[in-house]
Amino acid sequence: MSRVLLVNPPFYRFLGSHYNASSLGIAYIASHLNANGHDAWLYNADYVNRQSYANLDEMFSQYSNYKEYFNNEDADIWNEVVEKIIEFQPDWVGYTSYTANVNTIDIISRKLKQRLPSVQQIIGGVHATLDPRVLEEVPAVDFAVR
């Protein structure tokens, strides 16, 4: 069957912190896919191997750095995420979305499409459900699950 990688894109890492919990929604999807013969895995691109988190003041002080990542698509984090996805050798990549990470998904999906054009990319989650124009916002993504 298919190799599927379900991705929680980075967000908190841009603000000098991280998010080490798994996304429950994509965990449910991976479980269902695995139970039906697919090889599905999760990739939390916000994961950092440390126990301490930045407080809100520290995160807000990093906002200018956050904006810089979106002005520099050659930043290490973009290449890191795309390389991790490629290492998995997926047939399908699914992204969980909320409004704050749609630009992140756009950059990652475009870079991935350049490197692996045969990989099918899907966006789901809150933003994809609520915004009927989501595929216009992330044109490298092939399908939206609403």
What are the residue ranges of the model-derived segments?
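Glycine-rich beta-alpha loop elements in corrinoid/cobalamin-binding modules
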Residues: 32-33, 41-49, 70-146
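Nucleotide-activated donor-dependent transferases that construct or modify glycoconjugates
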Residues: 3-17, 92
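Short catalytic helix/loop segments, enriched in acidic residues and glycine
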Residues: 21-34
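Residues that mark the start of a beta-strand
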Residues: 1-4, 39
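Proline-rich low-complexity regions
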Residues: 9-10, 22-23, 90, 132
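Short, hinge-like loop/turn segments at secondary-structure boundaries
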Residues: 23, 58-64, 138-141
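Charged, often glycine-rich, active-site loop that binds/positions anionic groups
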Residues: 49-75
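A short, glycine/small-residue-rich beta-strand->loop->alpha-helix junction that serves as a flexible
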Residues: 12-24, 97-102
